[in-house]
Amino acid sequence: MIRLLHMLGWLTLLLGLLLQIWLKDHDARWAVFFYAMPKPCLLGLSVWLTCWPKLGRSQRMPACLASLCLAFWWLSTSWCMSERASIPTKNALNDEPLTILYWNLCRPNGLDQEMVDLVKQTQPDLAVFVEAGNAGSLLAKYSESLPDYRTELMPRDILRLSRLKTASNHSVLVPRMATYAQFDLAGRGPDFPVIVADIFPHMFHSRKPQIDSVFAQTLRRPDAIVIGDFNTPLESVHLAQFRKHFTEAFEAAGFGLKETWPCGMPLLSIDHIWVGSEWEVLAADKFWRLTGSDHAALLVTLQRKSKTR
């Protein structure tokens, strides 16, 4: 029985490596296994195989080498250590930095005090939250707690707090297995679009149609900003269009592991902020508030690039 478990452990490790290196989530039939076996889980499995009882040194060596290779591979692809740009002083309106806070609140039962405290701490220009729960009946309390912000609950529990003027509000579209909302903001040069996405996970459906649907809302505009819970790790092949036309903010200017879920464990990077080429990412931070949500919150500081650069 012990030998059988040891063999199953190795087979699982080899399957996970095959998924991470080659198969990925091209096909929905095996995508769930790709999502379930990220590099940190494979590293944990290889360490477990290294510590397997009643094995000699030579028998442990393959698992030990696999652990070292996986640790290097994971850290080299997940650890962000970008040099932050200096945040400029406020001069012309175009030069003012734009600070955005995003967080999946995981449907709180009442007023989310953790969220209120984080907004007060970070003072963003725009804060957006998905899975805001029954926030509609609490808008007055949120407005009272955060009087500097215009508070609005959009359909499908997307909550927006903004210090910027909303130039236009587009209808919320709800394609199969996903929700997203789009609105234009004014106050940092020309009006620019913001798309907030919440893609639902499903074991037997590919996430590509939903990701492509969200991408289509950007119209490939270089000033677009896309925020949300993609329920899809940054290693996914379905994010190729985003990688071609946009920059992921934490990868560009963050420090630390880019994974945002679950509960402080760096397993999957499913919460993203994508910015178009007209934006420079000055800083990106990640906050864990484990009593408030099993997702990390993301805070980014952007600035429009000068046309003369």
Which ranges hold each PLM region?
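N-terminal signal-anchor transmembrane helix
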Residues: 65-118, 169-172
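N-terminal membrane-anchoring alpha-helices
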Residues: 1-92
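Soluble catalytic domains of enzymes that build or remodel membrane lipids, polysaccharides, and related
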Residues: 100, 106-120, 126-309
